[in-house]
Amino acid sequence: MVRKRKPIFKKVLFAAVLLYLMLITILTVFQEKLIFLPTVLDSNHIFTFEKPFQEIDFIANDGARLNGLHFRVDNPKGVVLYFHGNSGDLQRWGQVASDFTKYNYDVVVMDYRGFGKSTGKRTEKKMYADAEIFYDYVTQ
């Protein structure tokens, strides 16, 4: 009887390892779609908010359009550079600005590549470079 258990154990172990490898492969292939849930807006979309704002655009080194919003207040104490989460777009995240403008801070929020009006393909390196473009904007 002990001999029969060994082949069954090997089959179960083989199936578990195979299932694990398939799961890892699927997660690797689809990780971008599982992590980032962008909302894409028309390039002619018009934002509307209660607070005054300026729409800002930058062109990255690779030609991608980077879209952002700058919410301004009179005599700001400083500026908040806000990077939103892994979903949505500026239409949704622009609402966060009022949480900071009520305390007299300017707010700049950007859309990542492939979100909202921003174009281009995301990579970790490009996301850092894009963040630097907006950082340079708020520190000038």
Where are these regions (language model features)?
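A short alpha-helix capping/helix-coil boundary motif
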Residues: 9-11, 24, 33-34, 74-77, ...
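Residue-identity detector for threonine
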Residues: 25-28, 39, 48, 101, ...
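An N-terminal hydrophobic leader/cap segment in hydrolases
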Residues: 12-59
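N-terminal Lys/Arg-rich, disordered targeting/topogenic segments
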Residues: 1-8
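Generic, low-specificity signal for short hydrophobic/alpha-helical stretches with a mild N-terminal bias
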Residues: 8, 16-17, 40, 50, ...
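Membrane-embedded segments
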Residues: 61-138
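Residues at structural and domain junctions
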Residues: 8, 12, 21, 117-120, ...
